[in-house]
């Protein structure tokens, strides 16, 4: 078991089945709950990135021609390695992201469960099909795109990347993986699990680095990019490929998600699901509700009072503190300051603070939950604040609640807490989002379903169960084993 004070020295870039010590610019990650150095390594150089792309191309033909059953066997061997390293991986996720250990353990379980679900999804959505016609066999098969880049996210450093990598490999692609620069240590352990699975050299390659490394990687000869992150970064990726439409992009870009509270009987249940919607993972889930839309009534007042009290009593701290915390820090001290500045701007726009978000410890990402009433604010920004911070909006009638919920250019998740089934039907019919939940947190999602949004939340390439769709392309064939002249020939042709 690693010590909190131990600095992990990087193994290097993972290229062609080997760890290669590089000499690029220094890259470091810190424990956001303490501000202490955790991992030290190097950014990938341009030469290392080009070499990784070369070996991925070289490995592609053999890997694509490997049977699906054999490719699936490697992914199951990967799961065995993750199982062996379950405790170490969970602890490392907590050290590098600040998540409570209970949440990191849940993430590791998601990594493990993803493989069988991805195999099932591939067989259901991209399995070969054949239909006999009068003239030939009509065949549908699927081929891999080629070399795909996976750009990892820090909030689920093992699970979200894995959600792209596993279906990409199952489909026969080779992978160039650039983790988030905030979570390189977790990425190294995940890649070591792939290495120990016996995966052939060149099939997966890992390149650590900052945004500049990512830009260099995207300029290579690649056929796909799978990204999870902010709208601003996703937009830059989209613009970078405006002259390369042949490269498939799967972009998941977050949201300014609404949660509507109806005139409910169980206020405590509404508070509980709202906390899970807004504050879990320190508000760093793309599905977190940012806007809480409550009735301007006694019910709304009571809900807000209890919600604020529960947030004030919430345990916040390092993952190894006792009693165990509900949330840890945001990913860095820099991000914490950015979120506090966003709160200040909302106050200047007319927002009324109910519970201030505050920095709890200098040089860390530890912030307390914040709540602000934006009902009377002028022109509130339609932006995602990736923090434990909720904006309150009040409504007088349910139609107004739906109107407020839809006042966003995003469209990832939306939720309704209500005892009224008719209201849910109205909500479902009128809300524009890729995930719509009823009496469940907005953060509740299942890997057995698609995961993706509309508007500025994505580009219509949902992941999770539908990831198989963007990892392979369909090939339609009309086939017959013997070359013959048809009995019924077209008019105007004479064959001697």
Swiss-Prot record:
The active site is at 252, 286. It catalyses: N-succinyl-L-glutamate 5-semialdehyde + NAD(+) + H2O = N-succinyl-L-glutamate + NADH + 2 H(+). One of its GO terms (molecular function) is succinylglutamate-semialdehyde dehydrogenase activity. Pathway: Amino-acid degradation; L-arginine degradation via AST pathway; L-glutamate and succinate from L-arginine: step 4/5. InterPro entries: Ald_DH/histidinol_DH, Ald_DH_C, Ald_DH_CS_GLU, Ald_DH_N, Aldehyde_DH_dom, Proline_metab_enzyme, SuccinylGlu_semiald_DH_AstD. GO terms for biological process: arginine catabolic process to glutamate; arginine catabolic process to succinate; proline catabolic process to glutamate. CDD domains: ALDH_SGSD_AstD. One of its GO terms (cellular component) is cytoplasmic side of plasma membrane. It comes from the Bacteria. Keywords: Arginine metabolism, NAD, Oxidoreductase. NAD(+) binds at residues 229-234. NCBIfam families: arg_catab_astD, PRK09457.1. PANTHER family: DELTA-1-PYRROLINE-5-CARBOXYLATE DEHYDROGENASE 1, ISOFORM A-RELATED, DELTA-1-PYRROLINE-5-CARBOXYLATE DEHYDROGENASE 2, ISOFORM A-RELATED. Catalyzes the NAD-dependent reduction of succinylglutamate semialdehyde into succinylglutamate. Belongs to the aldehyde dehydrogenase family. AstD subfamily. This is N-succinylglutamate 5-semialdehyde dehydrogenase. It comes from Legionella pneumophila subsp. pneumophila (strain Philadelphia 1 / ATCC 33152 / DSM 7513). The gene is astD.
